[in-house]
């Protein structure tokens, strides 16, 4: 069985990677808006 701390760490990493993807999408949209 996983220790609770390991599960928490995996959850945080998963959420962070999703947030990074969403942030990258927003950043690219904003960059396109200002560059063009």
UniProtKB/Swiss-Prot annotation:
<keyword id="KW-0800">Toxin</keyword>
<comment type="similarity">
    <text>Belongs to the limacoditoxin-7 family.</text>
</comment>
<protein>
    <recommendedName>
        <fullName>U-limacoditoxin(7)-Dv63</fullName>
    </recommendedName>
</protein>
<comment type="function">
    <text>Peptide with insecticidal and antiparasitic activities. Induces irreversible paralysis in D.melanogaster when tested at high doses. It shows a moderate antiparasitic activity against the major pathogenic nematode of ruminants (H.contortus, EC(50)=41.3 uM). Does not show antimicrobial activities. Does not induce increase in intracellular calcium in mouse DRG neurons, suggesting that it does not induce pain.</text>
</comment>
<dbReference type="GO" id="GO:0005576">
    <property type="term" value="C:extracellular region"/>
</dbReference>
<keyword id="KW-0964">Secreted</keyword>
<feature type="signal peptide">
    <location>
        <begin position="1"/>
        <end position="19"/>
    </location>
</feature>
<keyword id="KW-0732">Signal</keyword>
<dbReference type="GO" id="GO:0090729">
    <property type="term" value="F:toxin activity"/>
</dbReference>
């Amino acid at each position: 069985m996983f220790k609770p701390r390991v599960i928490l760490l995996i959850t945080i990493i998963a959420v962070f990677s999703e947030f990074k993807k969403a942030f990258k999408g927003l950043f690219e949209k904003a960059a396109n808006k200002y560059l063009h």
